Amino acid sequence: MILEQAVLAVRPGQSAAFEEAMRSALPLIAATPGFLGIEVRPCLEESGKYLLFARWETLEAHTAGFRGSSRYEEWRRLLHHFYDPFPRVLHFGPPVAAA
């Protein structure tokens, strides 16, 4: 399993609209082969920041499968205008330690 991680900085005053847009965008990513799940959590210390975790079977399921699809174009239209700055997305492999 691959874990995708991004810290999303949402423009001030846009959190409620972002959360609504994110909920409406979930079916777009969920329809991707190799998609295993997603969580978007609000930061408790910094208003307007969110942590996105998405789980994928493979890196390619995200990079080629989702980002290469027409569903990603709609995802971008719904969500990308909320971010300032645009988030850096990283992908992580299997854990080296867990408890």
Functional labels for PLM-detected ranges:
Residues L3-L8:
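Active-site-flanking beta-strand signature of metal-NTP-handling nucleotidyl enzymes
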Residues A9-A21:
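Short, surface-exposed ligand-recognition loops at beta-strand->loop->(often short) alpha-helix junctions
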Residues P12, L44-E46, E60:
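Feature marks short, surface-exposed loop/turn motifs that line or immediately flank catalytic pockets
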Residues P27-L36, R55-L90:
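An amphipathic, aromatic/His-enriched active-site/gating alpha helix that lines ligand/cofactor pockets
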Residues M22, L26:
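Short amphipathic alpha-helical/adjacent loop interface patches that line ligand
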Residues A9, F53-R55:
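Short hydrophobic/aromatic beta-strand micro-patches
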Residues I2, E39-E46, L51, E74-A99:
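Glycine-rich beta-strand-turn "strand-cap" elements at beta-sheet edges
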Residues A16, E60-H62, A97:
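Residue-level signal for secondary-structure boundary sites
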